[in-house]
From Swiss-Prot:
One of its GO terms (biological process) is tRNA pseudouridine synthesis. This is tRNA pseudouridine synthase A. Keywords: Isomerase, tRNA processing. One of its GO terms (molecular function) is tRNA pseudouridine(38-40) synthase activity. The gene is truA. It comes from the Bacteria.
Amino acid sequence: MRTIALLLAYDGTDFAGSQWQTDIRTVQGALESAWEALTQERRRIVLAGRTDAGVHATGQVAHVQTTTRHNLQTIWRGLNAHLPVDLAIQNVGEAVPDFHARFSAIQREYRYLIDCAAAPLPQLRHQVLHYAGTLDVAAMTAALKLLEGTHDFAAFTTATPAQRSTVRTMYWTRVGDYEWFERRLLAIEVAANAFLQHMVRMIVGTLLLVGRGRMTVDQFGEVLASRDRRLAGPTAPAHGLTLTAVRYPPGLIRWVEPSKRQNGTTKVEQPSSYVHEE
């Protein structure tokens, strides 16, 4: 039995989330169908993180246990040949036998994009939240920094069963410029050991109150300390959010070299968001 790791990118617009659901189009469902078409095996493919309907990914990771004898390049090309246009394998790797895409992960990173221009750019309508106004980026940065470290994030998640911990460790945060289609956007980026359901979108929705002057930095900190969801802002729309990276301890995965991608003729440098071992 082999354990194969997959690096995924997808446009979440037309997926009902990443996790498999009966008779509903999901990322996991599309992957498992493509795997069966390629290998004639029915296997459960496990994703590192669950993304909601409309949320995108450029650095999602999955694993599958298999007896296929296909080499990694054949798996890569074959899966992409069977996958829909809004889901693609970016890299494949041979993982250690006990590797688990979810439980072996030590860090996950998300980016939320906001366009503050007077008029929206139609090409970005599925990946960027349009907000026609001025935001106080300095205040948003200061508020977001309050989340760094280990905290109880109960105020920034939906109702959670009492037995589940809402404590998470936020490793770093950033609010800054991001250019796309020659458009200057505002990016909110966060990295943590794990995230709660809707956590990033609730943080962004509350940060927007700070940016608009409807909540102070101190009040944002009070929301965190309160553990009360009712004090936080609205949940930001899903389409502005992208899972950009999942990171693992070194030595768990041997990824295919970028120079061996697909046709093997052009060396492609691997973007930093695709480096999944530290």
